[in-house]
Amino acid sequence: MKLEFSGIERRLEKLDVCLKKLKPFRSMQKDEILKDPYFQDIIERNLQVAAQSVIDIANRIISLDALKKPRDYYEAILILGQAGILPLDFAQKLAPIAGFRNILVHDYLEIDWEEVNSNLQHIGDLETYMQHVKNWMREQESTQ
C-alpha cells in the first residue's frame, strides 16, 4: 500500500466495521427499532461515521488527484463522479448522504426515522462505494 493511501485504507476499514454493525438492523421493523433507544443510538452513530468516512475518503482522493476543490461535502462526492472515479449516476445517488450526515450531526433533535431507515436499507451503496475506491487505488498503484 502506498503511504498516501494509508488514510484512505483506515477509513475504508472503519466504514466496513460500521456496515457490519448496521447489517443486522436492516431486517428489523422500524417499530422494533423505535422501541429501543440503544438500537437507535447504534444505528445513528454508525450511519454518521459511515457517512463521514465516505466524505473523508472523497476529500482525500480529491487532494491526491488534484481535482477541483469542493464547496461542500455533497459536491466532494459528485466530483468523484465527474472525474470518473465513481460512475456519475452512482455519485449523484450517493451524494445526498452528505446532507444526511449533517442532519445526524447538527439536527439530532429532529431525526426523521423514515430517512434513517431509508439510509439503513441502502447501505449496500456504501459497499459499492468501497469497491470503486479500492479499484481506483489499484489503478493508481499500477500506473506508478
Regions inferred by a protein language model and the residue ranges of each:
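Solvent-exposed interaction patches of small proteins and small membrane subunits
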Residues: 1-144
